[in-house]
Structure formats: C-alpha cells, structure tokens
From Swiss-Prot:
The keyword DNA damage applies. This is Chromatin modification-related protein eaf3. SMART domains: CHROMO. The gene is eaf3. InterPro entries: Chromo-like_dom_sf (IPR016197), Chromo/chromo_shadow_dom (IPR000953), MRG (IPR008676), MRG_C_sf (IPR038217), MRG_dom (IPR026541), MSL3_chromo-like (IPR053820). Residues 100-114 have a biased composition (Basic and acidic residues). Component of the NuA4 histone acetyltransferase complex. Residues 13-66 form the Tudor-knot domain. Residues 86-125 are annotated as: Disordered. Involved in deacetylation of histones, chromatin assembly and chromosome segregation. May act as a transcriptional oscillator, directing histone deacetylases to specific chromosomal domains. Component of the NuA4 histone acetyltransferase complex which is involved in transcriptional activation of selected genes principally by acetylation of nucleosomal histone H4 and H2A. The NuA4 complex is also involved in DNA repair. One of its GO terms (biological process) is regulation of DNA-templated transcription.
Length: 330
C-alpha cells in the first residue's frame, strides 16, 4: 500500500478510468494534490482517454482510477457489454412506446377534448402518478454483471427445487461466510489504498446484512421453507454443530447467487447517488466474476430428493411422519 505522501498512480502510467458507468483505457499526464498548500490532501490525476480528443482530458479523483491489470481489463470489457446491451434494450422500448403513442394519439386527443372538468382532475392525478413512476425509474440502477454460467446455475437451481422437488444439502459445503472470506483474502492484496480496503469491507458487510434479512423473505422457494424452519430451530437453539451459527453459516453459493440476481431491485429502493451506485456496481460485479470462475468449488454438485412426507408438509398437509422427514433432509 502506498504511503500517504506518495501517489498510488504515477505520471505516464497506463490505467483504466471510469467515465460514467464504463471503464476506459487512459494515460496519466500529471499528478497533483487537490489542495496545493496541503501536502496531506488527496491526490488527483490529469488523464487522457486513449483515442479521445485532448478536449476530454480531465482531472479526476483517485477513486475513478483502476490499475491496468488483466482482471480490471476483463471487468472493463464486461461493463461495456452490459452497458451496450442495456442501451439496445432501452432503445427498443422507446421505439415501441413511441409507435404505440402515435397509434393512440388521435383517439386520445379526441377523448380529452370531450372531457369535462372532473376528467381533467383525473388526468392530473394520472400525470402525478406517471411522474412518480418516472422518478422511480430514473433512479441510478445497478446492472450487476451476471456471467452466463451463473445464469445457467440459477436456472438449474430453480428447476431442481420447483420441478424436481429437491433441496440443496445443508449446511452447504462452503457457507456464505466462507465464500465471502475467500473472496476478501484474494482481493485484499490487490487493494492499493486504505480507502479501497474500506470500500471492500463495507460492501462485504452490506452483502451479509442483505442476505441475513432477505433469506426467508425473498430468497427461498416455497418448497424450501420446511427445510428452513427445521434449520432455524437448530441454530436458534444453539446446540451441537449449530452452536453460534445462523443463515450465513448454513446456506451457500446457490442462495447467495439468488441474492445477487435480486440485488438491482433491492438497491433501486435506496437513495444512493450515481457515484456510489457505480462504485457498488463495480464491487458487486467483481465478486460475481470471481464466483463464476470458482463455481466448481462452491456450488453443490447434487441436490437431495425430498421424501413424500416432506413434499406433503411443504404443500400444507402435515402428517405424523413429516417432522422426521424434514429432519432427515437437514
């Protein structure tokens, strides 16, 4: 880690720099303190984006820069593809919306001309609702990178549980806590400043908190709830192998990946600014790319087939043997 008196990035260094949501290759032209009279003030960097006109040269804070490593280049490529896909999707929706609007235009104009005062009040109320909805959708969104193999694993996971009536064997072979600890251990040496380390720690803490609160509310399929109830009794009792354990120690990669699939909707309900949103997206995307590369290590290779008694209980038809059946599953 560079000392406070030394800049993390040097003049003429090749780097990657964020411009809005995308990382671009750039070169550092100059380095200075944000306050020339205070040598302890943060550094800022004059960057030139490769292939761009000099008029785009800009002084940027350190948190917009990334080292020019293979890992960060892969992230830059992935973020660009995600942004291009989102732009194409948005363009398609806009075109369809305009076409539908023009088709309804004359009829709507005629209707509004014939509407009385009460109708105008209704229209105003409708416009207010539309304005609220548009405000919601203009909040910074977090398009987390979800590699194809993780998407495929999510589909298989859904089919195993909902169609095949199977459940993941729990405790998982690698818990959520263990997976996150492994990621941090590998990621820490790459963090060149205390600020970057602080961000990493905050994000990991946030993931744990989200998982803990979201598990029984949105991450479980209905068929898994009986298994969850049985496990919860064990860790709340705090006896045996479940002593001082909780969801983060019992569940693993399958349910953690489900969380990341729902994370954009969860974050959309917060009031983060664009800069914070972009940084969070970068951190979460780094994790999904890492998990994708290590999927063989963390995901279950097989699911457990539920007993008939468990199936009946999951449908709300308890039987005398159901409790024992649930216990055998966990």
């Amino acid at each position: 880690m560079a000392p406070a008196s030394q800049s993390t990035y040097q003049k003429d260094e090749r780097v990657l720099c964020f411009h809005h949501e995308i990382l671009y290759e750039a070169k550092i032209l100059d380095v200075r303190h944000t306050n020339a009279e205070d040598k302890k003030s943060p550094f800022e960097y004059l960057v030139h984006y490769k292939g761009w006109k000099n008029t785009w040269d800009d002084w940027v804070p350190q948190d917009r820069l990334r080292k020019f490593t293979d890992e960060n280049r892969e992230l830059a490529t992935t973020l660009r593809r995600e942004a291009e896909a989102a732009f194409r999707q948005k363009s398609t929706k806009t075109t369809l919306k305009r076409k539908a609007g023009s088709d309804r235009g004359s009829a709507r104009d005629s209707e509004e001309r014939q509407t009385s005062v009460p109708g105008r009040v209704t229209k105003r109320a409708r416009d207010n609702e539309i304005e609220k909805e548009e405000h919601f959708y203009t909040r910074p969104s977090v398009r987390i990178v979800m590699p194809d193999n993780l998407k495929s694993l999510l589909v298989d996971d859904w089919e195993n549980v909902t169609k095949n009536q199977q459940v993941v064997a729990l405790p998982a072979k690698a818990s959520v806590n263990q997976i996150l600890e492994d990621f941090v251990a590998e990621e820490k040496p790459k963090r060149t400043s205390s600020a970057d380390l602080d961000v990493l720690e905050e994000v990991i803490m946030g993931i744990k908190e989200y998982f803990d609160k979201a598990l029984d509310k949105i991450l479980l399929y209905r068929f898994e709830r009986e298994q969850y109830k049985a496990l919860r009794k064990k860790w709340e009792a705090g006896s045996g192998e479940y002593s001082e354990k909780g969801p983060l120690d019992v569940y693993g990669a399958e349910h953690l990946t489900r969380l990341f699939a729902t994370m954009p909707e969860l974050i959309a309900q917060t009031n983060m600014d664009l800069q914070s949103t972009n940084r969070l997206r970068e951190e979460l995307s780094k994790f999904t790319l890492w998990l994708s590369k290590n999927s063989d290590k963390y995901f279950a290779t097989r699911y457990m087939t539920a007993t008939n008694e468990y199936v009946e209980k999951s449908r709300g038809n308890p039987s005398a043997a159901a409790t024992a059946a649930t216990t055998r599953l966990v």
